[in-house]
Amino acid sequence: MNQEELFDVTVIGGGPAGLYSAFYSGLREMKTKIIEFQPQLGGKIHVYPEKMIWDIGGLLPVTGEKLIEQLVQQGLTFQPEVVLNTKIESIIRNQDGIFTLKTSSGEEHFSKTVIVATGSGILNPQKLSIEGAERFEVSNLNYTVKSLKRFKDKTVIISGGGNSAIDWANELEPIAKKVYLTYRKEELSGHEAQVKQLMNSSAECFFNTSITKLIAGDNHEAIEYVELTNHETGEVSHLSIDEVIINHGYERDITLLENSELDVAIVDNYYIAGNANSESSVDGLYAAGDILKHDGKLHLIAGAFQDAGNAVNKAKQFIQPDASEYGMVSSHNEVFKKRNRELIKQMMK
């Protein structure tokens, strides 16, 4: 390892927490790297690009897609090194205190500190467990909603009873011809307000019921009917549909922490047990965003930004113990003087 390969901060994860960590560590003049498993930055927000996000202070309602664009632009302000399509499988600490991050392809990355910002983990949607279902993924079997327009004036059935399924049912109900929701249990498990909205809408719900068969049309390329089975009565029915959406949750890949030789405290079999300063049980290793769990945690995107700032501040002091506890606010920070002048010139045109 040479000094060019050694970074002050390596952020694992390129979602909101990871991107803000990169921005703030650049603000604090640290050499920064982002490593992201997906082929693009943005994290889980890519799952809902057309959903409106209201709960970020000072930011007017914005689509997920637009928020990603802004987060990426901000996160790259100080030109961190970005490594995409790369899965970190383990973290070890060398005798000199430097962290070595090993990838699934055998590559190694070296860093003085690490911020884990992997959100809910590497997420893979749980597929519909019906033989032959995968062949319809190229036509009308969906595991996410990338465009609301696709479902305009269509008859749609959604399978699932959690927040994602309920949210999409509420989003699509005003624009689809008809929305059905089927759930294997007796009661929905989403947020109370969202459930109430759904039950007061024109959407039709089937409880204790699952999709048990997908029936293709004459062209054998798309689903034309779904078979529904009620688990209590055994009754079987068929619905004519245009689109099927499956929201059965996600399978988490947690090999990163399972393979780590570090004694990282974990809660609920996944989350990093930390504190309000984003510190973990391992000195020099911090967490930000959904992966971090502690009393008083704010489970919003805005909370991820606070986690990120705290993690960076602690990383800065870990590397440089006499450094200021906090970074200078942007309105008085020397690093922005030139940029501010350029922005003001543009505003005056």
Curated annotation (Swiss-Prot):
Family named by the database record = Belongs to the ferredoxin--NADP reductase type 2 family.
Enzyme class (EC, first level) = oxidoreductase
For this protein, the record's Gene3D superfamilies field holds: FAD/NAD(P)-binding domain
Which GO terms of the molecular function aspect are on file? Answer: ferredoxin-NADP+ reductase activity; flavin adenine dinucleotide binding; NADP binding
Which note does the record give on the cofactor?
Binds 1 FAD per subunit.
**Organism annotation:** Bacillus mycoides (strain KBAB4)
The reply on keyword NADP is yes
Q: Which InterPro entries match?
A: FAD/NAD-bd_sf, FAD/NAD-binding_dom, Fd--NADP_Rdtase_type_2, Ferredoxin-NADP_redctase_2
Can you tell me which residues bind FAD? Answer: E36, K44, Y48, I88, L123, D290, S331
SUPFAM superfamilies recorded: FAD/NAD(P)-binding domain
Annotated protein name in UniProt = Ferredoxin--NADP reductase 1
User: How does the annotation summarize its subunit structure?
Assistant: Homodimer.
What EC number(s) has UniProt assigned to this enzyme?
1.18.1.2
Keyword annotations from UniProtKB, A to Z: FAD, Flavoprotein, NADP, Oxidoreductase
Asked whether the keyword Nucleotide-binding is assigned, the reply is no
Which cofactor(s) does the record list?
FAD
